[in-house]
């Protein structure tokens, strides 16, 4: 597996290689910090992950399978199209309530925050939506000690600048029999 060869895969085992906007290649890292490992290369491209074994994360949040797809003959992962909404309010609470106006988010989606004024501590964070209604979402971010929200900001499902996209998976070792 991607988790130490025999461990259960997690969404954070291996950093994905960007191919194009929203498209990533699965790789197995060897060595440390980009140096060659025992295989002689810093990573190996994985073309055929075991179907049903792939998990994907953005930052430190595992994202639901409905928000990405994998081609098990190429090892390419495609993230769903970005969904973004302007923020009009954020509560100070153990689970932040974010006011957006009409939106298309649902429970389980992962959203990142940027460009918020006042409550700047939330910028760059990512949380899972735990509940929603027509104009708000509740995320698993404790904002109770943050500054008061004043204005602006947006939420996005796509990775924010600086966020790592990672995955875990099982794969078969290539073997040749003579």
Describe the predicted segments one by one.
Residues 62-67, 80-178:
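Small/polar beta-strand repeat architecture
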Residues 2-73, 78-83, 106, 170-178:
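Extended beta-strand solenoid/passenger and fiber regions
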């Amino acid at each position: 597996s991607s988790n130490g060869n025999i461990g259960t895969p997690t969404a954070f085992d291996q950093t994905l290689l960007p191919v194009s906007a929203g498209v990533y290649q699965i790789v197995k890292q060897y060595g440390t910090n980009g140096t060659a490992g025992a295989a002689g290369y810093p990573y190996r491209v994985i073309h055929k992950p075991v179907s049903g074994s792939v998990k994907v994360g953005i930052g430190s949040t595992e994202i639901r399978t409905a928000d990405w797809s994998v081609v098990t003959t190429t090892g390419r992962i495609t993230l769903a199209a970005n969904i973004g909404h302007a923020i009009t309010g954020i509560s100070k609470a153990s689970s932040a309530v974010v006011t957006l106006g009409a939106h298309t988010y649902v429970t389980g989606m992962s959203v990142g925050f940027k460009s918020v004024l006042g409550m700047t501590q939330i910028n760059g964070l990512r949380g899972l939506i735990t509940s929603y209604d027509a104009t708000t979402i509740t995320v698993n971010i404790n904002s109770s000690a943050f500054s008061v929200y004043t204005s602006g900001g947006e939420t996005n499902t796509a990775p924010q600048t600086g966020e790592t996209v990672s995955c875990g998976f099982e794969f078969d070792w290539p073997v040749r029999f003579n």
